[in-house]
Regions:
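Formylglycine-dependent sulfatase
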Residues: 2-7, 22-397, 401-404, 408-440
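Bacterial N-terminal signal peptides
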Residues: 9-17
Length: 440
């Protein structure tokens, strides 16, 4: 009996060790989100002046997508969709939210952080939040153990925005830095991210880091004055190259901790460049139109449901899982991130309707072919739908409806409107049907 007892204790001990070892194999997740970055703002996406060696290197290690879109062309809605896997009309955040404004991210929404926490993940939101500044909308109430950053954009100050709110860097719910200098933001966020990685690795916990940089959202002129920045791409290039250098430091921290090979690395932007920025953004005497990013051949701007507002850089790397040095031209969207992460992490999905789909197989299997379900473009209200190569856009201006249809494989710049062209009647009828079936 004594021997049997010892045997059971030994078995229990090794079972515990085995279970713990399995827990450590859960992949870490790092999502790096830039602000208002244009499709063509990185050297790996064709920019001839801005040098981004780190992110270019990650694209060579993994996958670069040329047809990745955000489901909304503005900040708060896009971020809400990314972090919940749902269209913004479900989350109640269909427009950028200001200080104290309603609505904000609903308590009933399940974020990536809330999905991963039951699986033992440490979670951190570092950088720009912009999904609500009170109550249950705060990051610590949305599944994040740590919040370090600001609740809005860094332009929420005079002369850019007329508000009584003072920009602050918070540590969880307590202000820590008042009126932070633009030159310090990227460094502050990166250092805090490295601390979080170090701490999680020491505790042997899988972790989720959501790192949302403020740049290159206007203004960039002040941030670009940081010592040591001399990009051929000017002020815009300075802040982007600064982020690239900072991401390299973060990756080195992952390597030092032996975590790089077990980390899902995702890089993207919340929406396209603010090419139609209002006059107030230029009243500081130093901001120039050429400080705004570019969207290459794509038409439109942030805040507009043409491709430039939605189509953004997307790079993903997960050693041994993602394809290597591969360009994917299949349509993808930011709402696909939550289900894809759940698939890799074997996390339980939220018990309600998700709009995104897991694209793990597309990112992992060479020559994988499966039609992505329709992707909807929501700009406060539903304005478009894309399936495969075809996109339908329906907008209302002064009570008049404008209906547009484009074959994006042949006309990515959306120059030739094929709506009501009898040659494409079948495609038009199909897209109109999909538009009317918007699930959000």
């Amino acid at each position: 009996m004594e021997k049997f007892g010892k045997y059971m204790i030994t078995l229990l001990f090794f079972s515990t060790i085995f279970s713990y070892a399995l827990a450590q194999k859960k992949p870490n997740v790092v999502i790096i989100l830039t602000d208002d970055m244009g499709y063509s703002d990185l050297s790996c996406y064709g920019n001839p002046l801005i040098n981004t060696p780190f992110i270019d290197g990650m694209a060579k290690r993994g996958v670069l997508a040329t047809n990745f879109v955000t489901t909304s062309p503005t900040c708060s809605p896009s971020r809400a969709s990314l972090i919940t896997g749902r269209y913004c009309t479900r989350t109640d955040l269909n427009w950028p939210v200001g200080p104290g404004e309603k609505p904000c991210l609903k308590d009933s929404e399940v974020t990536i952080a809330e999905m991963l926490k039951p699986a033992g993940y440490a979670t951190a939101c570092i950088g720009k939040w912009h999904m609500g500044d009170y109550g249950t909308a705060l990051p610590n109430k949305q599944g994040f153990d740590l919040f370090y950053g600001m609740l809005y954009s860094h332009d929420y100050r005079a002369p850019y925005v007329q508000t009584d709110t003072v920009i602050k860097i918070f540590r969880n719910t307590r202000p820590e830095i008042y009126r932070p200098e633009d030159t310090t933001l990227t460094d502050l966020y990166t250092k805090e991210s490295i601390k979080f990685v170090n701490s999680s690795a020491q505790k042997k916990r899988p972790f989720f880091l959501y790192l949302a940089y403020n740049m290159p959202h206007l203004p960039v002129a002040l941030g670009a004055k940081k010592s040591g920045l001399h990009s051929a791409g000017g002020a815009l290039g300075n802040v982007i190259e600064d982020m690239d250098h900072s991401m390299a430091k973060l990756w080195q921290a992952l390597e030092r901790n032996g975590q790089a090979d077990n980390t899902i690395f995702i890089f993207t932007s919340d929406n396209g460049p603010w090419l139609n920025a209002p006059k107030r953004m230029f009243e500081d005497g130093i901001t120039q139109a050429y400080h705004i990013g570019t969207a290459g051949i794509f038409r439109g701007s942030k805040g507009i449901s043409y491709e430039a507002g939605h189509r953004v850089p997307f790079i993903i790397y997960y050693k041994g899982h993602t394809l290597v040095n591969t360009v994917i031209r299949t349509p993808l969207s930011n709402i696909d991130m939550l289900p894809t992460i759940a698939d890799w992490a074997q996390a339980k999905l939220p018990a309600y309707t998700l709009d995104g789909e897991s694209v793990k197989d597309l990112l992992s299997i060479k020559n994988y072919h499966k039609l992505h379900k329709p992707i909807y473009y929501v700009n406060r209200v539903l304005e478009g739908v894309k399936e495969g190569d075809w996109k339908l856009r329906i907008t209302t201006n002064d009570g008049k409806k404008l209906k547009e249809m484009y074959n994006l494989s042949e006309d990515p710049a959306e120059r030739v409107n094929l709506y009501d062209n009898p040659v494409y009647k079948t495609e038009q009828e199909h897209l109109v049907m999909l538009f009317d079936q918007y699930p959000g």
